[in-house]
Amino acid sequence: MRMLLKSFFSILALMACITASSAADEGTIIKGQVILDKVPKVEEVVVTADKAVCCKDGPLASTQMLVDPKSKGVKNVIVWLRPNDKIRGNEFPKDKIPEALRKPKAVTHIIDQPKCQFEPRVLAARAGDKLIVKNSASIAHNVNFASPIDGQSFNKLLQVNAELAVENAFTANRFPIAISCNIHPWMAARIRVFDHPFYATTDANGKFEIKGVPEGTWNIVYWHEGGFHMGIDGIYGFATEVKGKTLELKPVTLDFAKKEDKK
């Protein structure tokens, strides 16, 4: 009897996964790429502590702006959808999210700091997800965690080979969560949390995919640690008609300047 029940619940879990996957496949897949017009010179970090460890393999390169020399693709740009309006705080409408994608299984994300940098430096997550911060380095770090909406903030020492599970699950936040290390002040990480599934982070070639998007006109927002694409004008995103099985967008050249600044 116990085996039958176990098999029954396993089948239910599998069916839930298949349903969620089918819902994602039913909508439109948005594919795009974020690039820079020129590949910037890789900057070196000014290391002020633990130089023997942080610089043991040579100068420590900044990870703030990562651009692939060949494709000019920009890594760590978070791309998401929002309503086609200019109302600050409006998020993707819940009634437009397919039922199977409204309450996904929570994911536990991991941020490590093996080489005097947070890895990954930029993270996109969904409300309900959790976070573990690890320290696989041979030196101590500290985790200065500041969440601007839910007040979940702390500053804790993280010894060698230790890990810290953030107590509360993420809540949706229109401002990025900031993580830093007071011992090594150049270290930084950013987390954006959404209450819908229509977001992505660009890969090493600046490419991204957002699956299962309902048809309609949605605004696409591009955000990098350095700011929004097109500055303050880009906060509300750029109107895009979504339809069909796949929508291939033209590459977006990342630019932090406002339209007025270009006149």
Regions found by a protein language model. Give the residues of each.
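Positively charged n-region of N-terminal signal peptides that target proteins for export
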Residues: 1-7
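Bacterial N-terminal signal peptides
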Residues: 7-19
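Extracytoplasmic copper-binding redox domains, predominantly the cupredoxin/blue-copper superfamily
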Residues: 23-263
